[in-house]
UniProtKB/Swiss-Prot annotation:
Primary gene name: comQ
Native source organism of the sequence: Bacillus spizizenii (Bacillus subtilis subsp. spizizenii)
Record function comment: Part of a major quorum-sensing system that regulates the development of genetic competence. Involved in the maturation of the competence pheromone ComX. Acts by catalyzing the transfer of a geranyl group on the ComX pheromone. Cannot use farnesyl diphosphate (FPP).
Keywords (A to Z) from UniProt: Cell membrane, Competence, Magnesium, Membrane, Metal-binding, Prenyltransferase, Transferase
Catalytic EC class: transferase
Coiled-coil portions: none
Protein name per its UniProtKB record: Tryptophan prenyltransferase ComQ
Names of the cofactor(s): Mg(2+)
Annotated binding of Mg(2+) 1, by residue: 67, 71
């Protein structure tokens, strides 16, 4: 990622910001997902997949910055500590660099079309999230599929196309589910992270919609705490007590069941294609 920035960016001040932001990354799960698919499908040009993975991770970093700026999240991270206009310009630069890098790997019009489709769909999913639009669990899952699933689909599908030159619908379908799992895990983490704005802004995540069905007293208690920002953050400081309440509400079981269901569907689809990837 840094090599791409050093090669493409001449403005030294902007370059320094981008390198510092890249240093903030501590996971590269989207690039790894691409790499695993490329290897599983017998791709043999390491320079191609490394370039793809780097381009995708630049794009993911851009989306992370956009997301934090829009949600006012993670206030201790580097891009949230500078002038928002500079952070926004840096994110736009990373977004453009990511797309340019990805599209430079292949001359295929279909490869380019899919790259832009997934990026555009992810932004539309983010718009629905910012609008707090979902009213039902089905609508929320569709939003998660667009917002997060589009990026996991990009990672897996483009790697497969690099390996064998073909678009595979089955890979796209299960890759969307990988993204839904990632988003669900992220939303669950948002329950206990006081750096996140999910609670303060009452985001209609799948978790919130489940609680809002008020199956039991524990669900209602959590909702009341959510409506009292100070009480909520005081309560979650006692993690064992909060975990117990989540369990009583049935939330832990609900999230675990959904993840297990999607994982089983993903594994079944991979087995059909003789793809052996550990997620």
């Amino acid at each position: 990622m840094k090599e791409i920035v050093h090669e493409k960016i001449q403005n030294l001040d902007l370059k320094e910001y981008l390198i510092n932001f890249i240093d903030e990354k501590n996971h590269f799960s989207f690039g790894i997902l691409s790499f695993k698919h490329y290897v599983a499908l017998s791709g043999n040009r390491s320079s191609h997949i490394l370039t793809l993975a780097g381009g995708i991770e630049l794009l993911i970093l851009a989306f992370d910055i956009f997301d934090d700026l829009e949600d006012e999240d993670n206030i201790e991270i580097k891009w949230m500590k500078i002038d928002p206009s500079l952070a926004l310009n840096a994110a736009t630069t990373l977004y453009t660099l990511g797309l340019e890098t990805i599209c430079s790997i292949s001359n295929s019009a279909e490869f380019h079309r899919l790259t832009l489709k997934y990026a555009l769909n992810a932004m539309q999913g983010q718009h629905e999230d910012l609008r707090n639009s979902p009213e039902t669990e089905e609508e929320c899952i569709q939003m998660m599929k667009q917002k997060a699933g589009s990026l996991t689909a990009m990672s897996a599908v483009l790697a497969a196309m690099l390996a064998n030159g073909e678009f595979n619908q089955t890979i796209e379908d299960y890759a969307y589910k990988i993204g839904i799992i990632k988003q669900l895990e992220n939303d669950y983490y948002g329950l206990v992270n006081d750096q996140r704005s999910d609670i303060r802004k009452k985001r209609k995540t799948l978790i919130y919609l489940f609680l809002n069905r008020k199956f039991n007293e524990a669900s209602e208690k959590i909702l009341k705490l959510i409506n009292s920002h100070t009480s909520y953050h005081s309560f979650i400081s006692d993690s064992s007590k909060f975990d117990e309440l989540l369990f009583e509400a049935g939330l832990n079981q609900y999230v675990s069941m959904l993840i297990k269901l999607y994982e089983e569907e993903i594994t079944a689809s991979m087995n059909q294609l003789n793809i052996n990837i550990k997620l």
